[in-house]
Amino acid sequence: MKNITIETNRFLLKVLTVDIIGERYLDWLNGSNKSEYINYSIQERTIEEVRDYVASRENDNSILFLGIFVRKSGEHIGNIKYEPIDFLNKYAIMGILIGDMEWRGKGVATEVIQSSSMWLHNE
């Protein structure tokens, strides 16, 4: 899915693209604070592997993979992904990663899940 921007009070949700993937993002997956609940981060990943993973999802209409960006600063703090999306039955599996530790516990998930799920419901 291309050219999607969903606005919330504090965040912009934009389609995740390979140009966003850098060392900071890689640290979220490989670092000591990684989530044990993110299947993709079970093993150490290289920047190339992560970019390939993101690229493989960029043009797939059954996947909505969004970066979470702070509106005021543009800082990328995490991701939310719906995969696969069943538009006919209005069903999707959702996963979220708040990679920036400073933003954990501050209601990010609530805000972005509400806005992105409403957007998806209306699509």
How would you describe each model-predicted region?
Residues 123:
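Long, contiguous binding/interaction regions
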Residues 105-119:
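Conserved acetyl-CoA-binding loop-helix of GNAT-fold acetyltransferases
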Residues 1-51:
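A short, well-structured alpha-helix characteristic of acyl/acetyltransferase catalytic modules
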Residues 45-102:
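Acetyl-CoA-dependent GNAT
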Residues 15-26, 30, 70-73, 96-109:
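Short, charged helix-to-loop "capping" segments that act as catalytic/coupling loops
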